[in-house]
């Protein structure tokens, strides 16, 4: 097995980075389309007369923010020199668990466990934003 020369390794790295960037751009376009569809859905739910539409509206808002956070994560990836900041994944995790609590709140024990998971993620976020771990 021969070792690859430095220019060849850099070329392979550049090709893979380009493929990754194009994939993320495609994903971003798909998320923007879904964000637009969710906006239309939220407008429909907002003007629906049913009582259950309030829960659908809140759930739709949280899903809207999830799309928004994923788009912001991709934007931050390109702005920060092709790396994903950890705290954006934590934000997405918190929002996803909040959505889960809103949608599935039948079991008090499950809600307590989800709340503990949110607390753990908030502590993680606090640790990531401390001076020792701050990169930005």
Curated annotation (Swiss-Prot):
Keywords: Cell inner membrane, Cell membrane, Membrane, Transmembrane, Transmembrane helix. The keyword Nucleus does not apply. Pfam families: PsiE (PF06146). It is a multi-pass membrane protein. The chain crosses the membrane at residues 15-35, 55-75, 82-102, 108-128. GO terms for cellular component: plasma membrane. One of its GO terms (biological process) is cellular response to phosphate starvation. It is found in: Cell inner membrane. Its main location: membrane. Belongs to the PsiE family. This is Protein PsiE. It comes from Shigella flexneri serotype 5b (strain 8401).
């Amino acid at each position: 097995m021969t070792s690859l020369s430095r220019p060849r390794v850099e070329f392979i790295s550049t090709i893979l980075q380009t493929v990754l960037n194009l994939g993320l751009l495609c994903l971003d376009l798909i998320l923007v389309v879904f964000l637009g569809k969710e906006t239309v859905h939220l407008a429909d739910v907002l003007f629906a007369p049913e009582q259950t539409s309030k829960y659908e509206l809140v759930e739709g808002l949280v899903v809207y923010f999830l799309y928004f956070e994923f788009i912001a994560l991709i934007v931050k990836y390109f702005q920060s020199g092709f790396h994903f900041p950890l705290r954006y994944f934590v934000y997405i995790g918190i929002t996803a668990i909040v959505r889960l609590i809103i949608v599935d709140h039948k079991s008090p024990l499950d809600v307590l466990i989800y709340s503990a998971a949110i607390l753990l993620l908030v502590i993680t976020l606090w640790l990531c934003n401390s001076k020792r771990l701050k990169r930005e």
